[in-house]
């Protein structure tokens, strides 16, 4: 098992360092809560054959079209499971948020295609071999599998819905390792037990790039009229590499994956307050979506919150 995982994980990249130093650079009627998903989620630890009680990973989801949109172009995906043997327990989680663009039909189709194409690739290349009997070693590392999944999604959108585009933030948990594939301006955050909140992805927007270059301030970027214009999105332009980051799981704490309809409307302090006071990730997601709607709900809103074990 050790050799299997060593080959699979490949070279680790410290996501915390990269995110810290970017390049120069209960519910209202408008909220559509998604059912909570609860599954065994242990760290990759040794287990006693006589007493195996893995801790729980709890996942909550929430989504809304918002107050000013008559349709929803966001898509999400969530899968949580655990590989358990008589001596070890390895958690597996795959979570994705995609924010479509290109109009009602094209945007909705692009985001849906993206999550299905990415999920099917990861399940086929990683999940199925990992959980087969006997276990098979995938031919690629986690980073290579995630990169190939993004390319698969990109080409599928170009083929099936020309003119459509979407962001994609895909988070993969395997054992104690976190791998993120990212394109666009949806985001992944680490929320730690000390109350700190860290962005784990970089927005691929023109305004964010101007901020990285020092041409505008963070405050100016937040209200810039072109802040939602992207220079990188799935289904748009030639093939490109997604940003792939790998690190150890930031636990105990939470992972939040969300579209800009959430992070661009309510503040980080509001997000932290809601999560700290909520009784579960599902309730937290419903309350975050409701808060974004109460703030005007200018865009589609999607959130996935994963509570990590101690």
Which ranges hold each PLM region?
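PP2C/PPM-type serine/threonine phosphatase catalytic domain
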Residues: 1-310
């Amino acid at each position: 098992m050790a050799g299997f995982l060593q080959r699979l994980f490949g070279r680790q990249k410290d996501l915390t360092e990269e995110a810290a130093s970017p390049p120069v650079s209960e519910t209202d009627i408008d909220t559509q809560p998604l059912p909570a998903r609860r599954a065994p989620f242990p760290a990759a630890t040794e287990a006693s054959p006589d007493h195996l009680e893995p801790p729980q990973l709890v996942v909550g989801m929430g989504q809304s079209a918002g107050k000013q949109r008559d349709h929803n172009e966001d898509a999400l995906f969530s899968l949580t499971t655990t590989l358990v043997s008589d001596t070890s327990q390895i958690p597996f989680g795959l979570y994705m948020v995609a924010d479509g663009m290109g109009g009602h039909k094209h945007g909705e189709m692009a985001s849906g295609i993206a999550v299905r194409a990415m999920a099917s690739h990861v399940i086929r290349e990683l999940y199925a071999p990992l959980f087969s009997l006997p276990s098979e070693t995938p031919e690629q590392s986690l980073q290579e599998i995630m990169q190939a999944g993004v390319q698969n999604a990109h080409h599928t959108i170009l083929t099936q819905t020309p003119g459509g585009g979407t962001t994609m933030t895909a988070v993969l948990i395997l054992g104690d390792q976190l791998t993120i594939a990212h394109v666009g301006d949806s985001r992944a955050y680490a929320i730690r037990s000390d109350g700190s909140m860290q962005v784990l992805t970089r927005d691929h927007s023109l305004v964010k790039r101007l901020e990285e270059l020092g041409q505008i301030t963070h405050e100016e970027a937040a209200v810039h009229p072109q802040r939602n214009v992207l220079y990188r999105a799935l289904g748009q332009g030639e093939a490109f590499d997604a940003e792939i980051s790998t690190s150890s799981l930031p636990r105990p704490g939470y992972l939040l994956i969300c579209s800009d309809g959430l992070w661009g409307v309510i503040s980080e302090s509001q997000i932290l307050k809601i999560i700290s006071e909520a009784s579960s990730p599902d309730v937290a997601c419903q309350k975050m979506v409701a808060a974004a709607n109460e703030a005007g709900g200018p865009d589609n809103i999607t959130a996935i919150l994963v509570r990590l074990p101690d």
